[in-house]
Amino acid sequence: MELLSEDQVERVLEWYEKDPGEALVGDEPLDTIPLADLVALFRPDAEDPEMHLVYEVEPREVERLQQAVQHRIDLDAHDYFVAAYRTG
């Protein structure tokens, strides 16, 4: 996996319809949460230390993520994921 500098990566919170639709409903950037905080929160495998993969949001992560987004996170209404995208 190619290592990218932090200014080349944007991490976002994405929410999708629950089954059966699974369509993307919305997203918000997570640029106010430092990578170190996301790593501590999601505990990625050693193969993905910079969180370039997609992570499903579980109840224990909601409180910290909610501090960074305007959308009200509702795990009963949507499926949530933290994803990383290359910028530029």
Pin down the residues of each PLM region:
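Acidic, low-complexity intrinsically disordered segments
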Residues: 42-88
